[in-house]
């Protein structure tokens, strides 16, 4: 079975020569083979793929010159195979000031290498392991093994003196090494350009980095195809500032006395801006609150903006409209908790609201025996352009937007949706000017019928006239 590849922040040193035939030197002898004891480690499970291994009387290990130190770490099946096994050695330089000491570490799977004076190489016949070394010049060595094999891993530490490629057994120097071994889900938590995720494939659970902004690698550290800082800043500003297109619809809604609708548009503009400021990868990030809260509020505001606009176009009775607003907010919140990224979260409420709109307009057209809205200007200059803009936005969102073109296609989506609201939002409903309040309340058996243009907001309040008197 092939051994996994290792990841480290520095190249491994050249392997020292085999000490089966020790180099000539004063006081060097060839002692007989010994069976060195294996020191166990304590296992502390913190979370999924998060395990720390501790040694007794550690974390520092004293390495006498006459024998190596061997440690055993056991990785459990399924529970440990989906993470990253990390090993870190740090030499205490003050413990070896008098001699030029190099500490070698050999990490092998299932079979420990008998170091002693026989060999320090990390390979023997069909067995191959991972070699590390620390010295006065290179005090820290790190090794990372993604998706390690389960079973027992053995770490053998041995101190030698001299300068490579020739090493000899030390005389009196006892090297002190700080050892840190742990299992983590991802390499360095994927850094600033990635996110560590738990994945499952065919009942196999494992962790991996999802890199962003063009970064790649096990820990999202490969910048060969990474986006520049200027490009990241441009995409963030474009996604955030495109939400300012909601300002004209907010002003228009307030002037038309659609205060509740204006509040929804303001809510959407605010949370969409800060959600995209927090959603960006890399260092161009600004979060005012938890990411999950910002995402939920952004999605809810977007769907509610579509909902309240279409319901307002239906011109329903105030009580019915308020009930639909509240019911829509509750149902949309439930749908977003089930699946925030589902396409039907947008199409479902939109189609349902369009059904209510079509029903209301059909009933009104049948009662009045002519098309509603009755004026061609309303259709030509408002409804048709607004519908085309909104339809284009939905098509871009559903079929064109990808991960690569997200920053500019989604910015266009912001501007199109906000622009369509300005066309589709109906004009203000006119009041009966000049009619006494008592007459409005009782009517004296009659009902005042206001000109159709006045209802559609195509004439000013000064031009309001009574076109007919109808029996109530």
UniProtKB/Swiss-Prot annotation:
This is Transmembrane protein 8B. Residues 1-36 are annotated as: Disordered. Keywords: Cell adhesion, Cell membrane, Cytoplasm, Disulfide bond, EGF-like domain, Endoplasmic reticulum, Glycoprotein, Growth regulation, Membrane, Mitochondrion, Nucleus, Transmembrane, Transmembrane helix. The keyword Membrane applies. Residues 1-233, 278-292, 337-342, 401-405 are extracellular. Pfam families: DUF3522. Residues 255-257, 314-315, 364-379, 427-472 are cytoplasmic. InterPro entries: EGF-like_dom, NGX6/PGAP6/MYMK. It comes from Homo sapiens (Human). Glycans are attached at residues 92, 100. Disulfide bonds join 186-196, 190-209, 211-220. May function as a regulator of the EGFR pathway. Probable tumor suppressor which may function in cell growth, proliferation and adhesion.
